[in-house]
Amino acid sequence: DLQMYKGRQYIHDDKKIFGVFADSCPDRWGQRLMKRREELRAKNAGEKPRKLLDSDYLLGVYDEARMGGLRFKTELEGEFLSNDREFATPPWTSLRELEQASIAFENDEKGLNEKWLKQLLAPGSSLGGARPKASVLATDGSLWIAKFPSKHDDFNSGAWEMVVHELAVMCGLNVPEAKAEKFSRLGTTFLVKRFDRIESRRIHFSSAMTMLGKKDGANAADGSSYLEI
């Protein structure tokens, strides 16, 4: 939906953002964290929370953990946006603490506990999907995604993700390295190496949703299916 020429372009009426940028945006979990941050800011300032736009989600993601190869700045010679080292991606050794923060965040009905929010915001807001998750740095400096168990799980989702990953390997599919760890009785944390990084180099990617011109939430009801891929 974004054409290869310089100048202004306009999105179709049924979409809010070009697909190439949507791939760099947080999904439901990341948006939830960023909404909670705005609610907390507004509460402390005695204001009403402002409605966050897609551009707020796109540009508010912590730069180091942003998905894909795109980075953003407002001035050609300026700094990249959201690049504050105060929010650096946490190390592998903090996984247990991050899982506990995600559990506490889910159990906090109003979601205004600043302690849990600060721990999760930078490593978790950049990622897609609805599950609680965070980016972590392995000892070799590689970026991984940790997908934590959720209080809404009806089964051990992380363990089954590992099973599906192993099946993919057995089928000869090219999939990133993955691990399964258990830090609590709630379930298994599924860990997978980021496919959009080779050491410190960022890898551009385009999702099937973008390539097919779809938008988030599309499903079989409107004719969307894996057969199109």
Which residues are covered by each model-predicted region?
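Phosphate/dinucleotide-binding and metal-coordinating scaffold of catalytic cores
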Residues: 1-229
